[in-house]
UniProtKB/Swiss-Prot annotation:
<dbReference type="GO" id="GO:0015935">
    <property type="term" value="C:small ribosomal subunit"/>
</dbReference>
<protein>
    <recommendedName>
        <fullName>Small ribosomal subunit protein uS12</fullName>
    </recommendedName>
</protein>
<dbReference type="Pfam" id="PF00164">
    <property type="entry name" value="Ribosom_S12_S23"/>
</dbReference>
<keyword id="KW-0689">Ribosomal protein</keyword>
<keyword id="KW-0699">rRNA-binding</keyword>
<comment type="function">
    <text>With S4 and S5 plays an important role in translational accuracy. Located at the interface of the 30S and 50S subunits.</text>
</comment>
<comment type="similarity">
    <text>Belongs to the universal ribosomal protein uS12 family.</text>
</comment>
<comment type="subunit">
    <text>Part of the 30S ribosomal subunit.</text>
</comment>
<dbReference type="InterPro" id="IPR022863">
    <property type="entry name" value="Ribosomal_uS12_arc"/>
</dbReference>
<dbReference type="InterPro" id="IPR006032">
    <property type="entry name" value="Ribosomal_uS12"/>
</dbReference>
<dbReference type="GO" id="GO:0003735">
    <property type="term" value="F:structural constituent of ribosome"/>
</dbReference>
<dbReference type="InterPro" id="IPR012340">
    <property type="entry name" value="NA-bd_OB-fold"/>
</dbReference>
<dbReference type="InterPro" id="IPR005680">
    <property type="entry name" value="Ribosomal_uS12_euk/arc"/>
</dbReference>
<keyword id="KW-0687">Ribonucleoprotein</keyword>
<dbReference type="GO" id="GO:0019843">
    <property type="term" value="F:rRNA binding"/>
</dbReference>
<dbReference type="GO" id="GO:0006412">
    <property type="term" value="P:translation"/>
</dbReference>
<keyword id="KW-0694">RNA-binding</keyword>
Length: 143
């Protein structure tokens, strides 16, 4: 039974506060779960060094191999897998290049579609947009 008197505001607020803990988004935000377990530590993007170029198998019902790079993050040394979007994008990226990675925009920060275990995608290579390098609009910077 919920109080409904003229001065019941404080009690109503207290009850609402209690029920907020049933919302998983509220719980994740309050307990700062993303910052604790995310390799990017809650940041939208991070830079790192390419360790190796590899590929992963697509998930069913699709088939094929997706080109990815293993990146060691500068901020904490963790190694993550990043997707290289676009046709021929893997040819532009070399080992020991500095890349900027962003989230791949999957549900709740997870992997997207048929790409298993890959949560990030490459955005910049040595400070230049991967899309423009791929299309040949700009040349790759010498390091």
């Amino acid at each position: 039974m919920v109080p409904n008197g003229l001065f019941a505001g404080r009690k109503l607020k207290k009850i609402r506060k209690k029920f907020r803990w049933n919302d998983y988004r509220y719980v994740r935000r309050m307990l700062r779960i993303k910052e604790k377990y995310d390799p990017l530590e809650g940041a939208p993007m991070a830079s790192g060094i390419v360790l190796e170029k590899t590929d992963v198998e697509r998930r069913q019902p699709n088939s094929g191999r997706i080109k990815v790079v293993r990146v060691q993050l500068k901020k904490n040394g963790k190694v993550v897998t990043a997707f290289t979007p676009g046709d021929g994008a893997i040819k532009v990226i070399d080992e020991h290049d500095e890349v900027l990675i962003v989230g791949i925009r999957g549900r709740q920060g997870r992997s997207m579609g048929d790409i298993p275990g890959v949560r990030y995608k490459v955005y910049l290579v040595n400070g230049q947009p991967l899309e423009l390098l791929r299309k040949g609009k700009i040349e790759k910077a010498r390091r």
